């Protein structure tokens, strides 16, 4: 199969948090592959130069280049949808516990979820909280019925195109789970929504946490689909720019992409507004220097891991057909393609492959495994669980990377 697509790439020239153009490169990633691309292998599948940038005015991190979203998020090229498994249920419970601390009057809540991708979170929250009404908003729903079987209204649009619907529904609670990191300009999107929504609306967002990504050395989770990399400081600066007040912020160490951050806010009462000073120059320079060191450690460690995998003789197998496998292969210098196969417990992935990684996926029940097979955990989202399973089930040698 030969890929003839030549997707457009646009340069992101302003910070999505404060609008500054004072951006500097932290990390160059030439020919970075697309993640989550399951399908028939194509050696010519597109790769794109990428850079991780830091705003020298506020310290926020974001990508330099935006690959055409029509390519990135097409059904053929983007696998992620909110899944239905134990890990996701734990993340939903975390959000529910977070909401309970906001002491919402559920019977008065008219909720909308933006960037829903499917109805799983909406069903979960609506069942647990008995909101007055619940709607979901995502272009993926453009061909679906207005109401689903759970009484949830479906709006097949981008949030910025659904402002009349938001007004019609008298929304006073808006939630978005893993949405803002995909948005080119979060400040502009939220400004637009704030101008067209009840001023007392409570907003709740979950995003990957840059703090936890750095702490866990999950720099493999820097990838094309995530334009923005939030930490506590950048969220607070964003809210200040929007004239909003932070109500609550919590970190989920077991969240996606190394860990997540959930925060709630609302429009600030002008009478009580406080403009905090940001002594940022020294802080940003320190952050820039620390990131450079952390990235150097990461790249060195994964190069060693890749060299070791390639050096090992005999049969070698990965465990975990992860969404991020393409970036793991990238940072290990193609070592994942030196494995014989990838095991995965998901029966739907059996005999599948990746469009940009030359390796097949096999269910454990279908694989020929003996005591000489060497295992490499290849899903860092489930790293500990995989090591535990391998230790209990297979008396084999296990090669782990620098992530725990």
Predicted feature locations:
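Short aromatic-enriched loop/helix-cap "lid" or pocket-rim segments at secondary-structure transitions
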Residues: 30, 37-38, 148, 215-219, ...
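Extended interfacial segments that mediate partner engagement and assembly in macromolecular machines
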Residues: 46-51, 59-146, 223, 228, ...
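Glycine- and acidic
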Residues: 78-82, 174-178, 216-222, 290-291
């Amino acid at each position: 199969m030969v890929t003839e697509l030549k997707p457009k790439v646009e340069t992101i020239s302003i910070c999505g948090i404060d609008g500054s153009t004072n951006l500097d490169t932290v990390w160059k990633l030439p020919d970075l592959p697309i993640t989550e691309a399951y399908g028939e292998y194509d050696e010519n599948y597109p790769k794109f130069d990428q850079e991780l940038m830091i705003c020298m005015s506020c310290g926020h991190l974001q990508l330099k280049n935006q690959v055409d979203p029509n390519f990135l998020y097409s059904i053929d090229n983007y696998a992620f949808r909110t899944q239905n498994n134990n890990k996701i249920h734990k993340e939903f419970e975390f959000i529910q516990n977070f909401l309970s601390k906001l002491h919402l009057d559920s019977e008065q809540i008219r909720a909308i979820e933006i960037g829903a991708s499917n109805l799983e979170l909406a069903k979960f929250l609506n069942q647990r909280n008995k909101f007055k009404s619940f709607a979901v908003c995502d272009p993926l729903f453009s061909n679906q019925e207005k109401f689903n079987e759970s009484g949830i209204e479906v709006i097949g649009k981008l949030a910025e195109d659904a402002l009349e619907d938001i007004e019609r529904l008298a929304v006073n609670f808006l939630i978005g789970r893993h949405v803002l990191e995909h948005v080119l300009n979060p400040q502009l999107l939220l400004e637009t929504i704030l101008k067209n929504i009840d001023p007392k609306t409570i907003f709740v967002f979950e995003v990957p946490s840059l703090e936890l990504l750095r702490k866990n050395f999950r720099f493999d989770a820097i990838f094309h689909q995530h334009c923005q990399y939030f930490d506590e400081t950048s969220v607070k600066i964003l809210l200040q720019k929007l004239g909003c007040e932070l109500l609550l912020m919590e970190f989920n160490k077991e969240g996606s992409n190394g860990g997540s951050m959930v925060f709630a806010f609302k429009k600030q009462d002008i009478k009580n507004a406080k403009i905090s000073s940001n002594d940022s120059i020294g802080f940003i320079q320190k952050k820039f220097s620390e990131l450079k060191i952390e990235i150097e450690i990461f790249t060195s460690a994964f190069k060693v891991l890749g060299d070791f995998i390639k050096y090992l003789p005999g049969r070698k197998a990965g465990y975990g057909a992860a969404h991020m496998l393409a970036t793991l292969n990238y940072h290990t210098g193609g070592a994942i393609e030196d494995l014989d196969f990838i095991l995965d417990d998901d029966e739907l992935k059996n005999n599948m492959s990746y469009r940009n990684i030359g390796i097949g996926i096999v269910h454990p029940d279908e694989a020929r495994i003996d005591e000489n097979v060497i295992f490499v955990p290849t899903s860092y989202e489930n790293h500990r669980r995989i090591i535990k399973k391998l230790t209990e089930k297979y008396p084999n040698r296990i090669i782990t990377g620098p992530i725990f």
